[in-house]
Amino acid sequence: MQPSSGMTLGQALKAADLVGSGGEAKVVIQGGEVRVNGEVETRRGRRLIEGDVVEVGDERLEVR
């Protein structure tokens, strides 16, 4: 599933099957492994908007 506008960063990672649980999302995000629009993001509650680009490792997702 593609992340959609209004989702939190943690929800988006789960929806895209990049993590298996909210706890795993927390670890990955707080570990500095996630970038939003090229910047490291450590807040899993960050709301995403249309056009945001989320990157985790080699995976790249665009919010629609």
Tell me the role of every PLM-derived stretch:
Residues 1-3:
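Short amphipathic
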Residues 5-47:
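A basic, amphipathic helix-loop patch mediating RNA/tRNA/ribosome contacts
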Residues 58-63:
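Short, charged beta-turn/beta-strand-edge "cap" motif at the junction between a beta-strand
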